[in-house]
C-alpha cells in the first residue's frame, strides 16, 4: 500500500567451489514507497557470486524512491562476480538508482594501513569487514549483526 518501506540486504563470503546466487525482485505499485537493496559478496579461491535484481515501478506509483546496489570484493584473480541490475519504470515522478561494482582491495587503502604498521593480513581483514559493513549495518538486531561480524572474522582467519 501507500507509504510502504522495504529494505533488503545480504552479505556473503565464498571460497573455492562456492557458488552463491541472489535474485531479488521488488515491485512498486503504490504511491510514496521506498525500497533499498544492498548486497555485498567477498569471494576468494575461485568462488563465484551472482546478483540478479530488479526494481519495477508500475504506472501510478508516483513518488517512488528505489535504490539497488550490488558489489563484490574479489580477493584473487580466480574468483568471479556476475551481475544483472535492472530498473523498469512506468511512472514519471520517481527517484530510482541502481548499480553494480566488482574489484579488488583498494591498493591505496592497503598502502595507508601498511605504512602505519598494520600487517598485511590484518589490513586485508579490516578492509574486507569495512566493505561488508554497509550490508551488515542494515540489520536492526545488533546481537545478530555482531554474530555475523564474528562469523565473517572467523572466515577471514581461516585463510591464514
Label each PLM-derived region with a short phrase.
Residues 1-118, 132, 139-160:
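Conserved beta-strand/loop scaffold segments within soluble protein domains that form the structured core
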Amino acid at each position: 500500500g501507500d507509504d510502504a518501506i522495504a529494505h533488503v540486504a545480504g552479505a556473503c563470503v565464498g571460497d573455492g567451489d562456492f557458488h552463491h546466487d541472489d535474485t531479488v525482485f521488488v515491485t512498486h505499485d503504490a504511491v510514496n514507497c521506498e525500497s533499498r537493496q544492498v548486497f555485498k559478496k567477498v569471494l576468494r579461491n575461485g568462488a563465484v557470486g551472482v546478483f540478479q535484481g530488479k526494481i519495477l515501478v508500475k504506472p501510478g506509483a508516483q513518488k517512488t524512491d528505489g535504490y539497488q546496489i550490488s558489489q563484490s570484493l574479489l580477493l584473487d584473480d580466480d574468483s568471479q562476480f556476475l551481475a544483472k541490475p535492472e530498473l523498469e519504470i512506468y511512472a514519471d515522478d520517481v527517484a530510482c538508482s541502481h548499480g553494480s561494482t566488482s574489484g579488488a582491495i583498494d591498493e591505496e587503502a592497503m598502502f595507508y594501513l601498511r605504512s602505519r604498521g598494520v600487517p598485511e593480513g590484518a589490513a586485508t581483514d579490516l578492509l574486507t569487514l569495512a566493505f561488508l559493513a554497509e550490508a551488515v549495518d542494515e540489520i536492526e538486531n545488533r546481537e545478530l549483526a555482531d554474530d555475523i561480524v564474528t562469523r565473517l572474522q572467523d572466515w577471514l582467519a581461516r585463510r591464514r
